Swiss-Prot record:
GO-annotated molecular function: zinc ion binding
Compositionally biased intervals (Basic and acidic residues): 145-157
Keywords: Metal-binding, Zinc, Zinc-finger
Coiled-coil segments on the chain, per record: none
SMART domains xref list: ZnF_C3H1
Keyword Disulfide bond: no
This protein's name: Proline-rich protein 3
Taxonomic lineage of the native organism: Eukaryota, Metazoa, Chordata, Craniata, Vertebrata
Segments of skewed composition (Pro residues): 35-46, 69-82
Annotated source species: Pan troglodytes
PANTHER family: PROLINE-RICH PROTEIN 3, PROLINE-RICH PROTEIN 3-RELATED
Bias (Low complexity): 83-96
Zn-finger segments (C3H1-type): 155-183
Gene3D superfamilies: Zinc finger, CCCH-type
Amino acid sequence: MPKRKKQNQHQPPTQQQPPLPEREETGDEEDGSPIGPPSLLGPPPMANGKPGDPKSALHRGPPGSRGPLIPPLLSLPPPPWGRGPIRRGLGPRSSPYGRGWWGVNAEPPFPGPGHGGPTRGSFHKEQRNPRRLKSWSLIKNTCPPKDDPQVMEDKSDRPVCRHFAKKGHCRYEDLCAFYHPGVNGPPL
C-alpha cells in the first residue's frame, strides 16, 4: 500500500478528456501523421479541442488557432525590405543613393575604402562607353555639321508649324517635323 500512495502523489491530476488508446510507433495511424518527438512535429492535430476531428488536418496548433502553423525550425525570417545591412536587389530602394542616369544603382559620389577598386570601376566604364558611342553616332547622323552642304527635305505636304507662323522662327529649326514656309519648302 505505501507504494501506491507514492505513485498517486507523483501522477498529474486527471483531466476531463477521455483516455486515449496507446499508440504504437509505426506511423500507420488513421490520420497518417508520423510519430516523432513532439517538439519537432508540433502539437497533435486538434480542432475545437477534439482529437480525431475531421477538420483537424487544417489546424496544427492549439484550439482556436487560425491556419496552419509552421514549426520554428522550418520557418524563415521575413525579407529585410529596405532595412538591415543587405540592401542590394531587395525591393524598390536597393541603393541609398537612388538610381543613376542609365537606370543602374548609383554609387556614392566619393567611395571610401572598400567601395571602389578596379572591378567596380571597370564595370561602370564598360557599361557607359558603348552608350556614349551610340548616342554620339545618333547625334552625328541626325545633326550634320554646319560646314557640310545641307540638303533640305521638302516638308510642304505637312501642316505649317504654329510657332514659325507666329514668330517667324522655330527653336527646332531643321529638326522640326512641321512645314516652315520658305525654309524647308516653297513659300506660301
